[in-house]
Amino acid sequence: MRPDKKNLSSLSAATLAVHGGNVADATSGAVRTPLVMANSYLLPEDPATMDWSSPDGLVYTRNQGHNQVCLEKKLAALEGCEAAVVFATGVAALHSVFFSFLKSGDHVIVSDITYQAVWRLFAELLPERYGIEATFVDVGDLDSVRQALRPNTRLIHTEVIANPTTKVADIGALTEIAHAHGALISVDATFTPPPFFRASQQGVDFVVHSLTKYINGHGDAMGGVVIGTQRMIDKIKNDALVDLGATISPFNAWMIMRGSVTLPLRLNQLLSSAGKIAEFLDSDDRIAYVYYPGLASHPQHELARRQFAGKGYGAMMAFAVKGDPDTQNRFVSNLRIITSAVSLGHDESLIVHVGAEGRGGFDKYPEEFRQYGHLRFSVGLEDPEDLISDITAALDETFK
C-alpha cells in the first residue's frame, strides 16, 4: 500500500505522528493546524435540522472544539482504534470510563497497585457515595483474578506497568478473563504509549493515557484520552464529557498535538537511555534495589519481553539507595541534573522520593519498597552518560 496522509492506516508510526489529525488552514494556507480559540461555532441556517444530542459536529467548545477533534483523530490512529475522546486531565479520562459504564450495585476488579487517584475512587468515593463495590487484586495472579469475579463484575481495571512499582500486567490474559465473564476491561497505558505498545491490539475495551506525560512529552500541557470503538467513545462523550464539562482547552489540545509529533523519536531515546541507567544502578552496591522491567531480576521480565515484543521496557524505574528515608532525601538533594518533582514522561528527568505515609495500597508494595521507601525515576532526554555521572556524584556525596 502506498503511504498517503489522507489514509492514516497506510502510515508508519513516525509518519503518522507528524501528519495524523493535521488539517491545513483553508483561510491562511498555514500547513499546520492553527489554534482555534472560540467558544462557539456557526450553526446551520436552520438549526432545527441539527441533532443536538449528537457528539459529532462543532457547536460549543465544551462539547468539542476543532483542536480537540484533530487531536482525537491522531490519538485514535496512533493506537490503531476507531475513535478517541480527550479530556482536561488523565484522571478525568479515567473517571469518564467509570462514570459511563458503572452503576450502583456493580462490582469492579482493580489492580492492588494502582495510581492513587484510582485507588481512592474505588476504595472510598465510588463505594461510599454510589454503591459500586471494588476488589483490589494482584492482577499478576490470574487465578486470584478469576476467583474475585462475581456475577455483578462489570469491569476489570489495571495499568500496563504499575505506578510506581513497575509491576507488569499480562494484558492479553486479563482481557480474556474479562470477556469470558462478560465484563469490560480498561487499561491505563500511560507508561507504555504507542508505538512502543498498543494495548488495543490485546483486545481491551478502553485504553486510557494521561496525555500530560509521554504523549505531550514537554511538561507544559495537561490532558487525558480514552481510546476505543466508536460506539463506546460516543457513549463516553454523551455521558461524561458534554454534561460534566471536563473538556480540554483548545490551547492544551494544540500543545499536545504539537508535542506528540516527536513521540516516536523521543521514545527511541528514552527506552535506550533507561536500559543503560537501570543496568548502571543495578551494578552499584550502594543501591538497595532497582525495579525496571528490562532487568533480568525484575519479577515480570519475561512477561515484559514477550508483551512488548522486544521494543523496550519503558522509561520508568523505581529504586532506593541503602539507608533510611533521610538517606533518600539527601541523595535527591545532591543531584544536579535530575529534577526533584512529581509527574513523568517529560523531556527532563524527574525523580520523587515516595514514602509510605498516607499511600493507599502501600502494604501490597514489594518488601524492599516498604523497608527503604522508594525513588520513582522518570528518565528524560538528557545524554544517559550525563545522567549516570549525576547519579554517581550524588551517591559519592551522600555516602562520603
Swiss-Prot record:
Its cofactor is pyridoxal 5'-phosphate. GO terms for cellular component: cytoplasm. Optimum pH is between 6.9 and 8.0. This is Canavanine gamma-lyase. Disruption phenotype: The deletion mutant is unable to grow on canavanine as sole carbon source while its growth on glucose is not affected. The modification N6-(pyridoxal phosphate)lysine is found at residue 213. Optimum temperature is between 34.8 and 37 degrees Celsius. Its EC number is 4.4.1.43. Induction: Up-regulated upon growth on canavanine. It is an enzyme of class 4 (lyase). Gene3D superfamilies: Aspartate Aminotransferase, domain 1 (3.90.1150.10), Type I PLP-dependent aspartate aminotransferase-like (Major domain) (3.40.640.10). InterPro entries: Cys/Met-Metab_PyrdxlP-dep_enz (IPR000277), Cys_met_metab_PP (IPR054542), PyrdxlP-dep_Trfase (IPR015424), PyrdxlP-dep_Trfase_major (IPR015421), PyrdxlP-dep_Trfase_small (IPR015422). It catalyses: L-canavanine + H2O = N-hydroxyguanidine + L-homoserine.
